[in-house]
From Swiss-Prot:
A Pfam entry, by short name: p450
Name listed for the protein in its UniProt record: Steroid 17-alpha-hydroxylase/17,20 lyase
Cross-referenced InterPro entries: Cyt_P450 (IPR001128), Cyt_P450_CS (IPR017972), Cyt_P450_E_grp-I (IPR002401), Cyt_P450_sf (IPR036396)
CDD domains: CYP17A1
One term of GO molecular function: steroid 17-alpha-monooxygenase activity
Chief location: membrane
Keyword Metal-binding: yes
Cofactor(s) this protein requires: heme
Gene: CYP17A1
Similarity comment: Belongs to the cytochrome P450 family.
Gene3D superfamilies hit by this protein: Cytochrome P450
Amino acid sequence: MSLMLAALILTVAFVICSLTGFTQRKLSGGRLPKCLPSFPLIGSLLSLRSDLPPHLLFQKLQKTYGNLFSLMMGPHYAVVINNHQHAKEVLLKKGKIFAGRPSMVTTDLLSRGGKDIAFGKYGPAWKFHRKLVLSALHLFGDGSAGIEKMICQEATSMCSTFERLNNAAHDMMPDVTRAVTNVICLLCFNSTYEKEDPEFQTMRKYSQGIVNTVAKDSLIDIFPWLQFFPNENLHTLKQCIATRDSILQKKFEDHKANYSSDSANDLFNILLKAKMNAENNNSSVHEAGLTDDHMVMTVADIFGAGVETSSTAFAWMIIYLIHHPEVQKKIQEEIDSNIGFERTPKMSDKGNMNFLNATIHEILRIQPVSPLLIPHVALADSSIGDYTIPKGTRVIINLWAIHHDEKEWKNPDAFDPGRFLDEDGKYVCSSSESYLPFGAGTRVCLGEMLARMELFLFTSWILQRFTVQVPPGYPPPDKEGKFGIVLQPLKFKVQLKLRKAWENRGLHD
């Protein structure tokens, strides 16, 4: 058995070495970006050995290799972009050319072979699916107003829970995550979860399991043949995906059983209606990307990405408000003067909340939820700047480096909402072009509008009622974070101290 295994490994190694040599010969033409040292079989992996997370390592390598450099990820040729000029060329100017996604073991498992939006193959079916999801975001009432009502409903429940804690030290993020999850559930399933619902707890467990394991299996994505050997992380990932799929499949079957043409009130029903229309028009549901697999994976994609993006961004907001009480106080003063205490905040207040808007922008700059965007792939021979980019090249955009570029931002590592205000204290969208918190172009994040609404409403609702601080005897939250699918903060405890002004509201009427 050991001889057979050794023979298999040698055979695979020979094939990969041959492919690597072929790839390097193919890349010999044109002006290519400066490349990290590369060796047969392993590519540039030796140059990537570091205690630094990938986004910080790429930022460090930028000083030696430039804003655009290349590397071999085993047999795969890739380029890393560290500045906004090249990033916007890829995402905007040449968005369709670079709209591809790499096929990788972990993402293929997550998406059943790219049958979703995040990892799906760019083409007519993918664009149709994306259009359907955008339709779902405009389901409730007049679009964003309906979504606002859902967010405020969850904010009410969340703040009531916090008031009952009576200043006790606790981890607030499970309650925040449930609120964010319920908004997504209403969009996808037209249902919500109570705090102690066992299914909700299961969903949180599998979601966290996916976040924890995907980033650890990068070698399997570089060398797919490793999946055939024992791997604890891959086993855990498969278990989490199986649990996710079991829950989503049940919801999908329930929707199919109860579907009627008048029930297009959530994403599953919108997808089912599109499938029925395609069948009535004798169109291929497979070509339209409307098989059962496509529909379940699209909902899984929106559900997973929507929850992790918004809850992670809000966690960073709380952490920085704790570390910068002067910023928190200034937001509270803005709330007090523009909203008061006789009503709760709403989206129509956004135009008067300059400092809160600036703070949200600064949070998304200094701690981008996804420091490395999902890799793109060149669908044809092309170029970035003055460099040749062959078809099939993987393109990694280092959003962290773009948001911490010393040439574009003054003191980029300092937390300063004022950088998004003009001389009169009015909010400006960005003081630099080096700002892409949700990506841009063809593959821009679908949940951008929802994430911004949740950040604005949840932050303003909480700060209207509470002051967020470190509980006595506890350390302040860590600002480093843990690299994975998202840049996730480490767990932390807070004390939500009820504001006197909120307690005394209405006493002087």
